[in-house]
Structures are given as structure tokens and as C-alpha cells.
Amino acid sequence: MTKYLFLVGRIAEFGLSCLNCAITAVAFRIFVFVFNNLLKHLQYGGPDGELGASLRYFSQRYTMPTNMAKGLLNDIATEELAHLEMVGAIVYQLTRGTDAQIVKDSGFGDYFMNHSTGVYPADSNGVPFTAAYIAVSGDPLADLAEDMSAEQKARATYDNILRVSDDPDVNDVIRFLREREIVHFQRFGEILNSVNEAITAKNKFFMSK
């Protein structure tokens, strides 16, 4: 069985106590799969998918008030792009080598007519990706709160995929991605507290006696 080896970006493990970021690299193997109609449940370009996450974090980093916040957003955005590549590999491997009868029987026809077995950024209903999925307010606290919500939505999406998937190889990848979303949620919570403290410190006023 052919294997695909992906380097899952630069993963930022943020230590709240020492306020340092240790950048590590993680490798993950993706196996070639047989055709599976699970494609309709995968979100290569959905509202809570990896593409939106990477663009959101790359765009938000510029207005972060601390270098640590900028670095964390950049690192997680980079990792999300690696996750997007992994999801794209799954979509392609689930659909390549299909024949006309499989396309007709599986409900894959609408997608196939437009994209064949190409990997197109759309949600599970075939709706194309749009920048309207991402939020960039320019307010660091609002954006980081949005990021925490986005990670929970991504985790919930992977939970839903695991409920309907009967492919153990696919499930291994989805579980890995789900775990990373949980870690991202925790890191964003930590950096939100740090940024809030930095902003509050600048707004303190002292009155002389």
C-alpha cells in the first residue's frame, strides 16, 4: 500500500508559565484508500475547515499587540495549511480510479461533472469556499475569541465525520486532526489571557496622593 508522508507544519507548543514557544515538527503518514462516498462529508473548503482557519490566522496576526501572539498565529496558520494538504490527500485518494457506475451509484455525480476527481475547495454540500467564512476585526481580543470558537467548531466537524465514517484509515487521520484542534483551542485561550494582560497594563492610571 502506497504511503504519503506529510510534515504537519511547525507546531507551536505554548508554555503559559515561561511564556516561551517551542517549535517542533510532526510527521504523519496517510495511506491510499479505496473509493468511499465519505467524500460528501469531508470539508476541504467548508466554513469550519482548515483553509478558512489558515487564512483567518495569517490575516489576524498583523494587528496582534505582542510578538508572542503574532508568532502563535503564524505557527498555527502554517500547521492548518499542512492539515489542509492532509484533507486534500484523503479526498483525492477516496475518489481516484472511479468508474461511471460508481459515480452513478454513490451520489458523486454532481461533484464529478464539475471537477472530475480534482480536489476543489467546497463544503460537504458542494458550496465553494468564500472569504465570508473568516472574521478579521482588527481587535486582538475579539479575534482571539473568534479563533477559540473556530477551533471548537472544527473539532465538532471532525466529531461528526467520525460518527459517519466506517473507514479506519480515514478515522486515524481525522482523530489526529481533531486532537490538534483541541490543542489550538487551549493555546489560543492562553494567548488571549496574555494579550488581555498586556492591553490592560497599558491602560492603567495612577493618581498621586
Where are these regions (language model features)?
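Non-heme di-metal
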Residues: 1-9, 18-209
